[in-house]
Amino acid sequence: MGLLLLETFGPIEWILLTVWILAISAPIIYSLKNKTPVALGISVALLLGYIVQYSWVVMRNYQIDVNFVWADFMLIPTRIDSPTWLHTLASAGFLHSQSDVTHVLGNVLVIALVGIPLEQRLGTNRFIAVYILGLLGGSI
């Protein structure tokens, strides 16, 4: 159902997408490897991912021809019935509006202030399970 825009990406789009994937995955992987709170890693991942997303806006403002990189990772309910788009159930949780920073800052504050103590009480594995359920539940 629908064409993936990834097929039309040039070098700039691939670089931006790669940096975004690294920005959202590296802090979480780091926290798992170093036994630091995963909630903190998620908070950092959300902030770094947003910074990379916002760099797309900056490029567009300087008339750099960049396709909308995030379209294949946004959750659009009408296309979720196709296996091609199942990845959006998870990726949408790390995408935020480039025009309103308050949403991502609110997410970061809640995850940092509530998530870290919750992770300490539940344990890392249970916290990850709760977070993934919330991530998927928020996408349904």
Regions found by a protein language model. Give the residues of each.
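Membrane-interface helix caps and helix-loop-helix hairpins in membrane proteins
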Residues: 30-33, 97-98
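N-terminal TM1-TM2 helical hairpin plus the immediately adjacent luminal interfacial "cap"
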Residues: 38-140
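N-terminal signal-anchor/start-transfer transmembrane helix
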Residues: 15-31
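Select subsegments of transmembrane alpha-helices in polytopic membrane proteins
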Residues: 11-14, 128
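Short, aromatic-rich membrane-interface segments at the entry and exit
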Residues: 13-16, 34-40
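Short, strongly hydrophobic alpha-helical membrane anchors
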Residues: 1-11
